[in-house]
A protein has these predicted regions:
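Glycine-rich portal/gate segments that line the openings of hydrophobic small-molecule binding cavities
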Residues: 52, 61-107, 165-170
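Stable alpha-helical elements in mature extracytoplasmic
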Residues: 36-37, 43-46, 84, 148, ...
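Hydrophobic ligand-binding cavity/cleft-lining segments
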Residues: 19-64
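Amphipathic hydrophobic-ligand
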Residues: 23, 109-116
Length: 170
């Protein structure tokens, strides 16, 4: 009887924590841009500047911190949509990369989101951007894992393609 009660309590605890049991998902997008690495880095390096090149965001405002210092918090506002906060985790100007996380809870179908963004030398005359993240599906069953990954990849693709078009036309 005691084993049955312990077993039932264990199952109840596991069932009541579905988000914790979900595995991490990964999204990634890359793009090659035919401009110098310095021009690309200059366009993307400011933690509070995503809305200047990503058309999905209408505003990007620093709440605390600043000057690309780890711990800086920004509020992102989706065009005609919700707002959510992100924290800068690391910033390396020399290697042209930074990482950040979405502060949970956020009005998005994800949780535990951590992302890295890096600008590197590409093939001759090109610069490559690498945008990667890991996260959990937090859509309450409304989206399959593949759909959530597609949602994030599509957001990356829209931003990177807009950046490419803008920089290559200057």
């Amino acid at each position: 009887m005691k084993k049955a009660i312990v077993g039932a309590l264990y199952l109840l605890c596991v069932a009541s924590q579905p988000a914790a049991a979900q595995s991490l998902l990964n999204a990634h997008e890359t793009i090659d841009i035919k401009v110098s690495i310095w021009k690309v880095w200059d366009a993307v390096k400011d933690f509070d500047g995503l809305n200047t090149w990503h058309p999905m965001f209408s505003d990007d405002e620093i709440k605390s911190g600043g000057d690309n210092e780890p711990g800086t918090i920004r509020t992102m506002t989706v065009k005609d949509g919700p707002s959510f906060d992100e924290e800068l985790l690391s910033f390396d100007a020399l290697d042209k990369k930074f990482s950040y996380r979405v502060i949970d809870p956020a009005p998005l179908p994800i949780s535990d989101y951590v992302s890295s963004f890096q600008v590197i030398e590409g093939r001759r005359g090109y610069t490559t951007i690498l945008w990667n993240s890991s996260f959990r599906n937090n859509s309450d069953g409304k989206m399959k894992d593949e759909e959530v990954i597609g949602f994030i990849n599509n957001a990356y693709k829209i931003g990177l393609e807009n950046l490419k078009t803008t920089l290559e036309s200057q």
